[in-house]
Amino acid sequence: EQGLIVETDSEFIDKKVINAEKKVFDPQNAEAVYQRAFNLLKKSQYDQAKKAFKNFLKNYPESDFSENAQDWLGDTNFVMQKYDIAINEYQALLSIFPNSKKVSHALLKIGYSYAELGNVSDAEKILIEVVQEYPGTTAARLAEERLRKISVGN
């Protein structure tokens, strides 16, 4: 009788494993999980959004939404004024997605974060990089504005 229970349990476990594997590679499920995290962010539920984005990135690293999730994770920490963590999250985006359209935004926010931490030297260095590497973009314009504020001591 115990053999039957074990066999049934292993069949049940095998089905759970198969279903779990399907979820990991299911793009529709990935989108739904991403959307739930994003909705938490829109509702200003930042701690929950952070957890949801981290969970998403852990479970769906190859998803089309992964670079957005990584960027939002940086933004969430930035809004929460956790600038050191924000810098790390933006640097992760640069490392994992070096060709992303989000690179200029991530660099800009790294510069902003350094400025908020009072690290003017690194802030200026990063913001100048944004201006030079991404001329004519919104990120470059915002970097120039922040550089002007830094130079007058604001």
PLM regions with names:
Residues 59-65, 96-102, 132-141:
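Short solvent-exposed coil/turn linkers within tandem alpha-helical repeat scaffolds
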Residues 1-43, 48:
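Acidic, proline-/serine-/threonine-rich low-complexity intrinsically disordered segments
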